[in-house]
Amino acid sequence: MAEPWFDELAELIRIPSVSADPGHAGDVRAAAEWLAEFVRRAGGAAEVVPTDTQPLIIGELAASNGSAPTVLVYGHVDVQPPDPLDLWESEPFSLEERDGWLYARGVADDKGQLYILLKAAADLAAAGELPVNVRVTCDAEEESGGHQIVDYLAADDRGADVAVIFDSGMTKQGVPEFNVGTRGLAYFHVVLRTGMRDLHSGVYGNAALNAMHALTETLAAVLPRDGVLPEPLREGIVPPTDEEIAGWAELVPGAELLSEAGARQAYQRAAEEFYLRTTAEPALDVHGIVGGSPVLQKTVLPVEAEANLSIRLAPGQDVETIAAAVERLLREAAPDGAELEVTRLSSSPPGLVPPDAPAVQLALDAFEKTFGRRPLLVRSGGTLPIVPALAEKGIPTIITGFALPESNIHSPNERLLAEYVPLGLETAGELYKRLGELDG
């Protein structure tokens, strides 16, 4: 491909920076070094900061002319494992263009999108026209659940006027979206014991506790009824605005998304209320249950059963309050005689971005100029810990991007529309120019 950015992006893509695999620790470090060197080549300062887990990339590209507002840029250079390799139609770490798409692991999540954001800043700096200070604050463990970037931001008192993250996408091609809310997450491991050992079902069945029965009874206390969680798990929800609700009508219908995913709706109105349920409401899911033996023909009462479950918190909810409510409901529902152990493995609060913030309005103007239409304001069903961390500092965050539902993020043949790279560069450049109007 003859585009001038292709070879440069291909260099970054070529580094197999899989943060979840200890065997790729050197590659993760190499990707971090690549990004720092990119900032330095653009005339900025940058360093790779080691941590207890994966490194951070911290740097700054100064505005071309004196005092200017500061834009914090976040992205991640680590990627998901490429497995299963036999399903890829090209080498996962070799950038390839075909049929109008760019294929490679990380091209959409998030190397390609982060590159667009930084390349646009570098081009403006080279022309002496960068109107903002670009503070690079990136990590290499987003795909493995790290928290170093959040800890770093908590300790950094410099502040910023706005943060920009290109690590998202749009539901429909040509219809950009800004995420103004992210859901939080609390993840639990539950162990339930009913005695000292497995028991003969012919001797003790219907008289002694069965750990599998007891666990399913316990879990039922926190599961939704017709898609609605128990009231203690709904406390604090900030409902979507009228503008957000109106925007859902422009998105791909929920029934279509469920069908394309090969999924079936869980409740009667689930498809109709897809965006409400997946972005603006809390959701609790059981991810795995272990107990007894589903393979061997054993006639026993299992003495122990385990489960993993998580709750996605809606914007506005307090993670400590909701996590405590989950544990309380589980303990109250456990049958008498059962021993229940509940361990919270991780948690992160939800985030809200004020859509009327001046920086957000300027960003909407920038996208409207390059896309020819104003972005929709939506919420993300996922969890992005950096958003509430920035909100704690009073920094509004612009979360957007160029991935599509068919970009195969986290799957074989990950891809990004090739035309979205030059469009993204133009849009990011316009974004910096508009944000330069902020009072620094």
Briefly describe each language-model feature range.
Residues 188-191, 303-311:
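Oligomerization/assembly interface segments of phage tail-like spikes and tubes
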